Amino acid sequence: MKTDKNLSYNSQWLVIGLSRNGYDKESKYFKKYYENIVTYLEENNGDITKAKYSVYSKLIISLTALGKDARNINGYNLLSYLSDFENLKKQGINGPIWALIALNTNSKYEIPKNKEAKINTTEEVLIKYILDNELEGGGWALSGTNPDVDITAMAIQALSKYYNDKDYSDVTKAINRGVKWLGKAQNKKTGGFSCMGYENSESCAQVVVALCSIGINPDEDARFIKSGKSPVDNLLTYALKEGGFSHIKGTDVNMMATEQGFYALVAYSRLLKGQTFIYDMSDLNIEKPKKISVDLTANKKSVSSNEKEIVNGSYNKTNISDDSNEKEVKSDKKSDKRNSLDSNEKINSSSKPNEEGWEFEGKEYNLKNPGEDNRIVQQKNKSIEPTPKLLAGIGSMIIVFAAASFIGKRKRVGR
């Protein structure tokens, strides 16, 4: 694969998909991505956004997928940027969803405490917020009272770690309601899914990933077979002969659609192989963080001796020791935290966005024109185009799944 010198944090989905599909982690492509991330963090002193904190979450996911410890990316603890829960909520429910996914990529990850934060972000705070924002009848949305396919699918992905866990029965029930709603939202003729009134590949891709996250085969489960077509069947109808995916049918290759279609197929492939969920990195050997010492006096910031605390409300570099006695986060911590929020940390469950509008999974919604999906206006992400080799590789994977889906379809018809 040709190394793209312009690889940026926006390349995260290709990195996640390729890495979780077994692409060599020592490749020049991944090394260049990591080098560019480090450079970008240094140039911005770690402060790369003031509104879309899911950027940090997705960086954590992609770097963990490469076997990197996100608590020490050249001295930056990326989890610290998720510490102020009010910041996460600027994107509505999207922020907490991706923060929880990022946190659970590595069982050793914890979000440091932030002395300046009104509400410190914790695993339980994130879970509670997502559950509190479930809509009546099941499902989740960015706003309003009607569930949204993409957000419902992503909420299920975020909560999937706790599915069928006796300590999280409320999570299991919420997921089941969400799955039931998705089944009803599926197009009865095409097997696909719509967002904002039109069918598209990304919504279908998110449903495929969501079902895989809880062990449901999206190509065989009877609840998701409509007119003989499954979500996998539908997703493959957006595949183009040059190897990528289109956003909506009849349009050219779209980078976002290609990324999401690709990693959805990777998630499905991993399910079929009995591997961990695409965002569950417990199968990887994560690099142990080395102890570092960083002088932050130039920034008028200080790091306390307690490595898990953030001082002055803005945290970027830490001292993290490679402690052989460091214990993994155990499941028995669940029961005593479900209702243990401090009285001063009551969560505002409103999904009210910041004034600039919401963004999730590349979909940008302008609050002044809430019916406008910017992906219609701008079909391609001009900053990062898929290379021919990448498209060819994805094309090969599509061919394999198309053949498997055809065989599966024949079996379904014969039942």
Which residues fall in each region the model found?
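Alpha-helical repeat scaffolds
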Residues: 28-37, 72-84, 116-120
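C-terminal low-complexity, Ser/Thr- and acidic/Pro-rich disordered "stalk" regions positioned immediately N-terminal
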Residues: 285-385
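C-terminal membrane-anchoring or membrane-association module
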Residues: 398-415
